[in-house]
Amino acid sequence: MTSIEPTHTGKKVIVGMSGGVDSSVSAYLLMQQGYQVEGLFMKNWEEDDNNEYCAAAEDLKDAQAVCDKLGIKLHTVNFAAEYWDNVFEYFLAEYKAGRTPNPDIMCNKEIKFKAFLEFADEILDADYIAMGHYVRRRDNSDGSTQMLRGVDGNKDQSYFLYTLSHEQVARSLFPVGELEKHEVREIAKEMGLITHDKKDSTGICFIGERKFTEFLGTYLPAQPGNIETPEGEVIGTHQGLMYHTLGQRKGLGIGGMKNSNDDPWYVVDKDLERNVLIVGQGGHHPRLMSTGMTVNQLHWVDRTGPVDGCHIAVKTRYRQQDVPCTLTYTDEHTLGVVFDEPVAAVTPGQSAVFYDGEVCLGGGIIDQLIRG
């Protein structure tokens, strides 16, 4: 492996150590660059079953093993109260209102780059924080800092970080954003880090791998109702609108319908007033397609957003191909977006994130869909 010439001697970085390979390699790379590195493990959820407790304990054990191997300190902190108040209650309120939120985005905003940064500043006297996210930062000659997509297009996580402020980006380092995932695993293996072959975590941010329906049902009462076609024919029942999202195909329990073709059924709409789930056949059903949307709760990383009438790219969900679009401001908090071509399964409550080439500009929450 090519050694990196140390260039940042003395600057202190607190790395969010999750017990995964990305944060492990981030800590190693920053040490190679000459930073004074310490780790911080966050506990953000009070586990309520043995499986979750064991998984969290395993993550902490792995984080400690990596820090021991690298010869750095590992601190721990409990942000469970902040997570509940600022992330989880929002998550439940959105589901209750019939929308589909993205808790990972709120978790990054409120916990990883707010509570974590404040703790690193006030308690650990950090110059920077670092996370194992696949994004990059660019420091421009005019003093501004921009957030760029990660080099690994399949792992790029800028969609989840669009709510970061200019100041938060300027205080954060993202070492693995310059690498492909396979390179990160190779570095971890070469360094003998225990996390080199640990599988990536999935599931809700910090809550972990659970059966989502059961988990949500413990916090929100389910309200069963009918499943109907767009024409109003009742063809089944659902256990609760909150368990379904636009474009969903699996788990509908519909099949073998008389007088219907073999095309799969998709969720194409929700009627909140009647508690009815509306389904149609085919992934490009007209009710599933949108020609545009309104976006509110706008946030721009570099403080000033794109100009009115500009033509840029948007993602309405993670890992989606860029969608070319034109923007029109209704006011400073709301944006009208018209897609160049209709887009399937645009979902209220999810985030719309805008890009100018490699630069993540910011985004907002999808509010209303424009159809036809």
Curated annotation (Swiss-Prot):
Residue ranges for the region (Interaction with target base in tRNA) are 102-104
Where located?
A: Cytoplasm
Enzyme class label: transferase
User: Which positions are catalytic residues?
Assistant: 107 (nucleophile), 205 (cysteine persulfide intermediate)
tRNA-binding found in the keyword field: yes
Q: Give the catalytic activity.
A: S-sulfanyl-L-cysteinyl-[protein] + uridine(34) in tRNA + AH2 + ATP = 2-thiouridine(34) in tRNA + L-cysteinyl-[protein] + A + AMP + diphosphate + H(+)
Extract one GO BP annotation from the record: tRNA wobble position uridine thiolation
Q: Which cysteines are joined by disulfide bonds?
A: 107-205
GO CC, alphabetical: cytoplasm
Name the Gene3D superfamilies for this protein. Adenine nucleotide alpha hydrolases-like domains, HUPs, Translation factors
Q: Where does ATP bind?
A: 16-23, 42, 132
- EC numbers listed for it are 2.8.1.13
Query: Which UniProt keywords are given for this protein, alphabetically ordered?
Result: ATP-binding, Cytoplasm, Disulfide bond, Nucleotide-binding, RNA-binding, Transferase, tRNA processing, tRNA-binding
Q: Per the record, where is site Interaction with tRNA? A: 133, 350
Protein family? Belongs to the MnmA/TRMU family.
Q: What does this protein do?
A: Catalyzes the 2-thiolation of uridine at the wobble position (U34) of tRNA, leading to the formation of s(2)U34.
Q: What is this protein called?
A: tRNA-specific 2-thiouridylase MnmA
Q: Which organism is it from?
A: Shewanella baltica (strain OS155 / ATCC BAA-1091)
